[in-house]
């Protein structure tokens, strides 16, 4: 037989397959014919025997028939017993033949049945053989697939081993990096602490030098005053008689912009103590009072922590009486999304709006229209608060990117970023100087900033979120989420007073005389607090008034005669501060909750902004 590698191998395989199939068929079908074949052979033997016996008996009738024609004398010669025996034998053989025929018929019927059964079994065998072949092919496929799967599993195991090794290496590397990061953070904290301590020492030294210089100046002036008290001084009305201090005061007043007709009268009243007609006959005591006033003015100017001189801007009262708005004059879709903050500049003709689109738009109020002036860009998050410095040349904004940012009017990009908070900054306000600011945040801190160096000079830790802040001469007032208003002395480290209110505080507004504070809270009320006695003087409510958010702003009118706030239904509510009654309800073009309102310093118009991108000018 040819080997498996030669060309005759396929022919040998199918021959062996046929032999195996025949042997299998012989084993399975042999048992069915073990009884049938011997019986059939026995039947054939009997049939052959009967055939032979029949052939022997065939001539006997011929031999018997002639005897019937013999005469009577011949019948006597036959044996009387021979004829019955032959007849009986024939009958017997006929009976046996019939029985054998029946047996042959039965056997033939059984052969037919067995043949039919054999055909059925052969068809079943073929079906089973075909099914077995299909199953064998399927088994071969499954074995091949199993081999492939096993190979793939081995490959995956190898890849997993490689990945595990790489992961362990990366884990070790990350551990080293984290350890290095912790060391660097500790070093950074140490450096920051040393830097803060060094800056604090430097600030203390500067303050000490300034204090010594001030004490020396006061001592020198005191000596000069003592010398001047011993002689009589005659002062004329000329411009040089009041000394350098008076000239400086006049120069400061000369820098202010020329007032409007209504402002001139107030300015003249404000300047009148320095231009009195009795100046030609001043006595020595009057001269001393004037010099002391000038010295007190210089002392109030002071210096910042960093040593840079602070300018205080006198707010000239230009609002004789605020006028209630009656109608909307201009409506603009100013921002791409909701508008959160609005503020008028000191000259009442410049307006700033800030929104969730990270932009601050400056507008000129021209008659009864708002005209676009400039767009301030570069904010790192949604604008939550805007404020002008006393000169009107800088804009400070609080943003959601954990910082406050400073712009100069006329420059589109941010000038300075005040970073240090750990959560959203909700309020940012200038103090009464352009060099200092205060911010409040949701990280439960209030921070004071020296803007000359962009340095946090003080951090106040509070127990609740800060939603708004306002600043006085020497006081910082903050409104919080725990339904409390806190007062902080800028010259001391601790809280000086806490006033509880019902509802989370959303905004604060300080009157121009710094004697009254207006708060808005989520209990849908406005409260007027008298700062002289530190108690709540008035509570304003109205049917339909409801705060729309945690940053809804309410403001005083410039003359403190009215309180203004916007509601979630888009209406504006105005209360009379003296009587506590609702003076007016303005239902205008707002279709969404009003977030903030602003009343210009002249009292002639106001602006409201809402969550639907609208800015509305009222007059």
Curated annotation (Swiss-Prot):
WD repeats: 334-373, 378-417, 420-454, 455-498, 500-539, 546-585, 589-619
Biased composition annotated in UniProt, kind: Polar residues: 60-70
Keyword terms, alphabetized: Coiled coil, Cytoplasm, Protein transport, Repeat, Transport, WD repeat
Gene Ontology CC: one annotated term: Atg12-Atg5-Atg16 complex
Sequence segments annotated as region (Disordered): 57-78
Superkingdom per UniProt: Eukaryota
Coiled-coil ranges from the UniProt annotation: 116-227
Compartments it resides in: Cytoplasm, Cytosol
One Pfam short name: ATG16
GO biological process, one term: autophagosome assembly
PROSITE patterns xrefs: WD_REPEATS_1, WD_REPEATS_2, WD_REPEATS_REGION
Family assignment from sequence similarity: Belongs to the WD repeat ATG16 family.
Subunit architecture: Homooligomer. Heterooligomer with ATG16L1. Interacts with ATG5. Self-oligomerizes to form a 800-kDa complex composed of ATG12-ATG5 and ATG16L2. Interacts with RAB33B.
Misc. comment: Although ATG16L2 is structurally similar to ATG16L1 and is likewise able to form a complex with the autophagy proteins ATG5 and ATG12, overexpression and knockdown studies in mouse suggest that ATG16L2 is not essential for canonical autophagy.
Protein function: May play a role in regulating epithelial homeostasis in an ATG16L1-dependent manner.
Protein name: Protein Atg16l2
Species this chain originates from: Homo sapiens
GN (gene name): ATG16L2
């Amino acid at each position: 037989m040819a080997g498996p590698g030669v060309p005759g191998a396929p022919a040998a395989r199918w021959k062996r397959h046929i032999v195996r199939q025949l042997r299998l068929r012989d084993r399975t079908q042999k048992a069915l014919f073990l009884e049938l074949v011997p019986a059939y052979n026995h039947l054939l033997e009997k049939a052959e025997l009967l055939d032979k016996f029949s052939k022997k008996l065939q001539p006997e009738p011929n031999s018997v028939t002639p005897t019937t024609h013999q005469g009577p004398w011949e019948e006597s010669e036959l044996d009387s017993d021979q004829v019955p025996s032959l007849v009986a034998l024939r009958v017997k053989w006929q009976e046996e033949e019939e029985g054998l025929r029946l047996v042959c018929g039965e056997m033939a019927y059984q052969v037919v049945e067995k043949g039919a059964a054999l055909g059925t079994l052969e068809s079943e065998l073929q079906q089973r053989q075909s099914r077995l072949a299909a199953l064998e092919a399927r088994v071969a496929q499954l074995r091949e697939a199993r081999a492939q799967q096993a190979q793939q599993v081995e490959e995956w195991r190898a890849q997993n081993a490689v990945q595990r090794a790489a992961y362990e290496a990366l884990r070790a590397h990350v551990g080293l990096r984290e350890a290095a990061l912790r060391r660097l953070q500790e070093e950074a904290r140490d450096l920051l602490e040393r830097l803060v301590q060094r800056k604090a020492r430097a600030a203390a030294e500067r303050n000490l030098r300034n204090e010594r210089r001030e004490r020396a100046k006061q001592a020198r002036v005191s000596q000069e005053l003592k010398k001047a008290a011993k002689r009589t001084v005659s002062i004329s009305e000329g411009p040089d008689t009041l000394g350098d201090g008076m000239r400086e005061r006049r120069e400061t007043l000369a820098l202010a912009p020329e007032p409007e007709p209504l402002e001139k009268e107030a300015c003249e009243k404000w300047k009148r103590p320095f231009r009195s007609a009795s100046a030609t006959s001043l006595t020595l005591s009057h001269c001393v009072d004037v010099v002391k006033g000038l010295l007190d003015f210089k002392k109030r100017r002071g210096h910042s922590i960093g040593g840079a001189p602070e300018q205080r801007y006198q707010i000239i009262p230009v609002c004789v009486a605020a006028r209630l708005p009656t109608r909307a004059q201009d409506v603009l879709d100013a921002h791409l999304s909701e508008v959160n903050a609005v503020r008028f500049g000191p000259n009442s003709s410049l307006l700033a709006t800030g929104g969730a689109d990270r932009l601050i738009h400056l507008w000129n109020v021209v008659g009864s229209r708002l005209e676009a002036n400039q767009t301030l860009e570069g904010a790192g998050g949604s604008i939550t608060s805007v404020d002008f410095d006393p000169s009107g040349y800088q804009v400070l904004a609080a943003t959601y990117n954990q910082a406050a940012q400073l712009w100069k009017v006329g420059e589109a990009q941010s000038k300075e970023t005040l970073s240090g908070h750990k959560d959203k900054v909700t309020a940012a306000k200038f103090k009464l100087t352009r060099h200092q600011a205060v911010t409040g945040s949701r990280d439960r801190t209030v921070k004071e900033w020296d803007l000359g160096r962009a340095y946090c000079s003080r951090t106040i830790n509070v127990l609740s979120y800060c939603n708004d802040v306002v600043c006085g001469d020497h006081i910082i007032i903050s409104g919080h989420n725990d339904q409390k208003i806190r007062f902080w002395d800028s010259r001391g480290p601790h809280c000086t007073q806490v006033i509880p209110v019902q509802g989370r505080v959303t905004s604060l507004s300080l009157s121009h005389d710094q004697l009254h504070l207006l708060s808005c809270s989520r209990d849908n009320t406005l409260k007027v607090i008298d700062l002289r006695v530190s108690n709540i003087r008035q509570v304003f409510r109205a049917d339909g008034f409801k705060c729309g958010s945690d940053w809804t702003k309410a403001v005083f009118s410039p003359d403190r005669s009215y309180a203004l706030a916007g509601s979630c239904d888009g209406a504006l509510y105005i209360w009379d501060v003296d009587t506590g009654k609702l003076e007016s309800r303005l239902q205008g073009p707002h279709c969404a909750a009003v977030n903030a309102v602003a009343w210009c310093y002249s009292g002639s118009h106001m602006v409201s902004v809402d969550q639907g991108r609208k800015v509305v000018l009222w007059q």
